[in-house]
Amino acid sequence: MSTLKLIPFSTSIDKQFSGRTSILGGKCCLQIDGPKTTKKQSKILVEKIRERISNGKVVEISASAYDTAWVAMVPSREMSGRPSFPECLDWIVENQNPDGSWGLNPFLVKDSLSCTLACLLALRKWGLPNHLLHKGIEFIESNISRAATDDENQVAPIGFNIIFPAMISYAKELDLTLTLPPSSLNALLRARDSEMIRREGKWEYVGEGLGDSCNWNQIIQKHQSRNGSLFNSPATTAAAAIHCRDHKCFDYLISVVNKCNGWAPTVYPMDIYARLCMIDTLQRLGIDCHFRVELDAIFDEIYRNWQEREEEIFSDVTCQALAFRLLRVKGYDVSSDGLEEFVEQEGFFNSVSMQHSNVGTVLELYRASQTRINEEENTLQKIHAWTKPFLTQQLLNKTIRHKPLQMQVEYDLKNFYGTVDRFQHRRTIDLYDAQASQILKTAYRCSAIHNEDFIRFSVQNFKICRAEYQKELDEINKWYAYFGMDLLSKGRNACEQAYVVTAGLIADVELSMARISFAQVILLITVFDDVFDRYGTREEALAVIHLIKEILTHYRWKAAPKECSQLVKTTFTALYDTVNETAAKAHALQGFCFKQQIISLWEELLECAVREKESLSGKNVSTLDEYLSFAPVTIGCELCVLTAVHFLGIQVSEEMLTSAEMLTLCWHGNVVCRLLNDLKTYSREREEKTVNSVSVQVGVSEEEAVAKVKEVLEYHRRKVVEMVYQSQGSNVPRECKELVWKTCKVAHCFYGYDGDEFSSPRDIVDDIKAMMFLGLPHLSTH
């Protein structure tokens, strides 16, 4: 009998990239073991975050010196000798950095060079103060060698190799003297030529770097959005306005400058994308549950945007993939047909503009492809077929220079379905940087994506939850020892294993009884597993089942007879008292008694365990179908879920719990967990001559048998996902359905790696330690 066995670990612990991807992530702003947080502090942060979410349409984004400079270069429609946007020139004059540069982050040298040269061009074009020019020129001349080197640690803005040489040429036209080493100029020109060849005509997004060589009227005809912009880029739109005086381009630029009070961001608008990123961030930090009402309102609005085919979503493949994934997982009816043009790698890179042809965008497509819910969704299957090997190759080639992005790609590729909530929350906390920049044609920050309040509250919330988890673990240990089950574990760290799994999937601090009851079921199943497999006899197993049948027959508990062995008394009494107490607490909350249903489930599980034990070498099981008719029950997914759902903070009914929908969902969950376990352990179980979904298949090779099991697993996993994600026509609360899927994700986590369940990879053990024991980072107060 193989149950949801867990990884033993020690509780004694010594004290590109390009595109919309964070480029300065990591732990640089974090310190370990900060002051003890309070619930009062958390409440203050909750209100601050709630206010920000409620004002979500006001997306705060940093000013772009680069884009502001290009807008400043646009001449007036009435008088070409004057700037159309003098307020942008004022902003440039007022925002030069002390070192003579312009730009958001001095560590991004290529970005600073690009921003600085663009600002110098604007100042020179309109004859503004020379002292600003001199300081800017000195900065460029001092740092130009760093722009001309292919330093893998130097992150370049999108199109830098095309735009920067073009701006140097434009500087000559304006008699702006730059004394640059010939070697640096030659290196920049070689990089430009290489980039032009590599991009194969996909240059429109960086059209300002091509100047008169562009057919601007054709670009406008092909790419102009309803808001008048080109690619929602003020810089590209400004270049178009300079070259062909398009009135819609001017109208867009006027709206941007008016909205931003005299400057331009590097992308506008980005309201929808920023709010999607905010939701994704709050979910990954584990604090979205505190803002359900506010986030649901945003989801409803974005779904309306999706139905109306809002241009901001569908003109941006990154935004579209992210919106699709978040909406589908939330339960909205969204079709994957809109992603059809990205089903092939070549077609993707030929169809998207430069700002989307990056690892970050491909990662979003890969994540979206994992939400496939039926066999007919060939679009998602085809996207998955190329995005996974593409991302894998990027890792092998070490072309992802941004470490946090590299780590995220590694984690998602390794075991996408095995993402345990609390593990992910802690991992995100460790990687999160509230001061991180993102980069397009220049670096920018958006407070809806990287926000200090988010990380502060996440850390405080994690500490509060962890304190509760430690208390609950103590309760579990006492309960386990009270019934003498610790004497049966034979050194297995059972309580810690079971509880970490439970807290990993039921994270909300208020759901204490749900965690405790779920963990108790895991532990009881594990004890009976040991009794049946290791310590007990067939007669003792049957004795326990007989006692349970007595309860079902007489509708009352009956203590184990004196003549029963101590093993029978210990296991039955633990089950007897625990089910009694859990049922009483559930009755008080829900108003009905579910005891008989749970007892029936225990009877079924133990009878199937006996049958599994008696099916050694598969002699009594002739087919895979026959094996699947009983073996999945012994994994315990259904029993764990139907016990814990009473304590999820929602009202449930007996009719719902016994409905065909709920029982079908639990059955699919049982099969997923069972087959994952089988795929992990079939080699060992073959040696032990234990029946398994692989070994039961006769007349085929082991490779064919494994392939068949994986095929069946994929079918049932897709069924679970479909039933969880689809809300239309469902009578089962989302919280109950998610508990089944999260249980499957735990099985994916612990069985989805190489090795067996008792020799898990180092990173899982590290996740466990980080979740329960290691010091949490904190931000210094100021």
From Swiss-Prot:
InterPro entries: Isoprenoid_synthase_dom_sf (IPR008949), Terpene_synth_N (IPR001906), Terpene_synth_N_sf (IPR036965), Terpene_synthase-like (IPR050148), Terpene_synthase_metal-bd (IPR005630), Terpenoid_cyclase/PrenylTrfase (IPR008930). Binds 3 Mg(2+) ions per subunit. GO terms for cellular component: chloroplast. Mg(2+) 2 binds at residues 529, 533. Highly expressed in leaves, and, at low levels, in stems, but barely in roots and flowers. Its EC number is 4.2.3.183, 4.2.3.131. The keyword Nucleotide-binding does not apply. GO terms for molecular function: magnesium ion binding; miltiradiene synthase activity; terpene synthase activity. Involved in the biosynthesis of ent-kaurene diterpenoids natural products such as oridonin, miltiradiene, eriocalyxin B and nezukol, known to exhibit antitumor, anti-inflammatory and antibacterial activities. Catalyzes the conversion of (+)-copalyl diphosphate ((+)-CPP) to nezukol and miltiradiene. Mg(2+) 1 binds at residues 529, 533. This is Nezukol synthase KSL3. A motif (DDXXD motif) lies at residues 529-533. Belongs to the terpene synthase family. Keywords: Lyase, Magnesium, Metal-binding. The Asp-Asp-Xaa-Xaa-Asp/Glu (DDXXD/E) motif is important for the catalytic activity, presumably through binding to Mg(2+). Pathway: Secondary metabolite biosynthesis; terpenoid biosynthesis. It comes from Isodon rubescens. Abietane diterpenoids (e.g. miltiradiene, abietatriene and ferruginol) accumulate specifically in the periderm of roots. The ent-kaurene diterpenoid oridonin, main constituent of Isodon rubescens, accumulates in leaves. It catalyses: (+)-copalyl diphosphate = miltiradiene + diphosphate; (+)-copalyl diphosphate + H2O = nezukol + diphosphate. Mg(2+) 3 binds at residues 677, 685. Signal peptide: none annotated. Its cofactor is Mg(2+). One of its GO terms (biological process) is gibberellin biosynthetic process.
